[in-house]
């Protein structure tokens, strides 16, 4: 598969006759404490569409209209008058790349999570600090692949997906839904007096001097990180739920069951000592958990992490139900009180005084003995439609971070789940042998 780039340009908000942003009241949007707690990195995803697809000029025009409603993505990161990190609403533009492939898309489908897919989207290093970079690639058969690369400090997965949806709606000429909510100042005020109920040191924050203690694997083929896509059918998930929910007052969720199962399988594959501590960090969306609720259209980050922890021996020797109980308890703990405790701590002055930094560190390339989970199961990726139909395939880009687990709904649309599992190559055969076992 040879990808040829034909053009690359900055697309700016298209305001039309008015020439200014409607309802614009600020040129700088300070990052919230929840934005700053997230990963300072770019995340890339890939969509595939069957023909027909609108011409590139139509997609570009739709992008310009969508950026009127989402000026953040046409801006740049900088600082505000107080020296705090902020999004500068300078309308510098989002990157728009046009490319072609020399093969029919069917010949390379399904796309595999290898370095080859990196050619289907821009890199975050490609532009002059652009926050959103998009590549549209036309295949020889007429199929279209759209690759997005977005700065995670600007928004979480749900908010970024809302922008993708808005672009498709603007391209079709329909109203943007959900309506974006840009007010980052009103939702996350600290309480008076501050009330820090939970420990946030060592959870969301770590000392600065540990920020660059990156663990790397040794050289050699066995220490290469490879990403394996695992497909869990609806039937497998039903059996897993029945096993994990036995005797419980209500069935456990698909997310909890699949994460518990993969946590155990990955721990077995790694061959951890039974007394070694292992945890799984699960991203928890606070929109519906906070009171008052944060609107679905909120454009920033509203994510903290549940961190169930146990020993490797306890995890693998006890049934999956035990792991589900650990996960359920910790996820439930990340409630309104926890979010507000975090906000109070982040505004208490302790972060600056103690020189703390976010534990969400994109430089960490090896997470063992731990796991981190990004669940995209409830994000409506398959609702995106430029006018030629919804995508028939979606995937994250190649991201070889050992232990970073990404879950998403299968494109089959039948309730099955796809999991992207990065492990050292030396551990992958063992993982493949146990990941479909319910023993």
Curated annotation (Swiss-Prot):
According to the UniProt record, what class of enzyme is this?
Answer: transferase
Catalytic residues (UniProt): 152, 385
Catalytic reaction list? 4-coumaroyl-CoA + agmatine = N-(4-guanidinobutyl)-4-hydroxycinnamamide + CoA + H(+)
Its EC number(s): 2.3.1.64
In terms of InterPro entries, this protein maps to:
CAT-like_dom_sf, Plant_Fungal_Acyltransferase
UniProt feature coiled coil, ranges: none
* One Pfam family per UniProt: Transferase
From what superkingdom does this record's organism come? Eukaryota
Its subunit composition reads: Monomer.
Give the record's family classification: Belongs to the plant acyltransferase family.
Q: Which PANTHER family match?
A: AGMATINE HYDROXYCINNAMOYLTRANSFERASE 1, TRICHOTHECENE 3-O-ACETYLTRANSFERASE
Name of the protein: Agmatine coumaroyltransferase-2
Q: Which organism is it from?
A: Hordeum vulgare
Recorded name of the encoding gene: ACT-2
